[in-house]
């Protein structure tokens, strides 16, 4: 079957979404794209599993968002770093769940990252053969939709409609709650996916 998705897939599918918010809400599309391009540069092989492993091994801990900043400030261009604006670096650093970006463009990337992860995890679960669309509880699908396309359209449209004229990017309460609960549901599925990946690597080796 098709391989499970990686961080490049995450960018290719998530970035166009956050640019949709930017265009619809008259934000800075270039700033949004720059943050989206840089936000996961510091991610490890094997995604968050690799991040957790490095965090347990490094004396001062490891977080991919801090590593992304290190990449753009100190490692790129043979150690010279990139001449990025404060707004871009702020968006990269604060795209994490507990972060609070200072710009609406940064918030757009942060929201897109959450939405992309949910749909990627569902797609990976289906590809791995441990999940079907019909397995997703109706309390989530009734609000968000029954396919990746429907979920994306619902969440993107909801963000745009509820953020017009506001100094924030927000969701309606029903959509926000359904998305949050679906993330929790998919967390359990992701545990099974990680176990499957480990078994496949052992078979290859």
Task: Place the predicted regions along the sequence by residue.
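A glycine- and small-aliphatic-rich helix-loop capping segment at beta-alpha/alpha-beta transitions
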Residues: 47-59
């Amino acid at each position: 079957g098709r391989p499970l998705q990686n961080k490049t897939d995450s960018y290719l599918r998530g970035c166009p979404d956050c640019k949709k918010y930017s265009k619809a809400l008259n934000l800075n599309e270039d700033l949004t794209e720059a943050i989206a391009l840089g936000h996961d540069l510091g991610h490890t092989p094997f995604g968050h599993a690799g991040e957790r492993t490095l965090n347990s091994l490094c004396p001062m801990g490891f977080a991919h968002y801090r590593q992304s900043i290190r990449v753009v400030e100190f490692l790129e261009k043979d150690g010279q770093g990139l001449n990025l604006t404060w707004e871009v670096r702020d968006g990269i650093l604060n795209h994490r769940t507990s972060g609070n970006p200072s710009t609406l463009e940064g918030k757009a990337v942060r929201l897109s990252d959450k939405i992309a992860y949910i749909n990627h995890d569902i797609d990976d679960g289906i590809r791995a053969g441990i999940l079907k669309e019909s397995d997703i509880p109706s309390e989530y699908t009734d609000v968000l939709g029954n396919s990746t396309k429907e979920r994306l359209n619902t969440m993107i449209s909801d963000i745009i409609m509820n953020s017009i004229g506001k100094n924030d990017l927000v969701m309606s309460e029903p959509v926000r709650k359904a998305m949050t609960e679906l993330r929790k549901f998919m967390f359990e599925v992701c545990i099974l996916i990680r176990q499957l990946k480990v078994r496949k690597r052992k078979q290859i080796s």
